[in-house]
């Protein structure tokens, strides 16, 4: 929690559960702050963080609360039109924490193309995927210094919630296998997404992902 932020609100459910997970993380250990919960809020070192359990972004009280920027990271919304409902609710800007789907939406990777952002025009912006944020800055430097004719990337990626703890049917038969026991080859949109922030590399980079049995840390080569 950034104590320099003016206001912070969270859209989720079960404040008590969120407070416990924030305080005690399976991977990152104990959060060095006093974390408490009440019916509709977290208390972090005495500072209140309101929690809302509203599924429709248009119904959230962003105008009443004076919210400027919404970080849409629920994983349920990746369509700019749907994300724009936060603006209907009173927010000024929306940042998608993953790749945008549907209509055209500005994708920004910091250090690569943030100068494309025009606050008068861009109200819903995608921050791309974690893999794209890893790949694009490296590709930018390599292309500027040496020139990329063709590229092949591999991301060795920690397993995610889209996978199964035990073998279980899945639309992708490889992902049907137990995430904590398997190295699973799968697709990644990161290579294609690089062209959204580095259009000069469109069609030049391809790649795939290897989901490996670790809960955190990923790498791109």
Regions found by a protein language model. Give the residues of each.
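N-terminal Rossmann-like NAD(P) cofactor-binding subdomain of oxidoreductases
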Residues: 1-176
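C-terminal substrate-binding/catalytic lobe of Rossmann-fold NAD(P)-dependent dehydrogenases
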Residues: 145, 150-154, 161-221
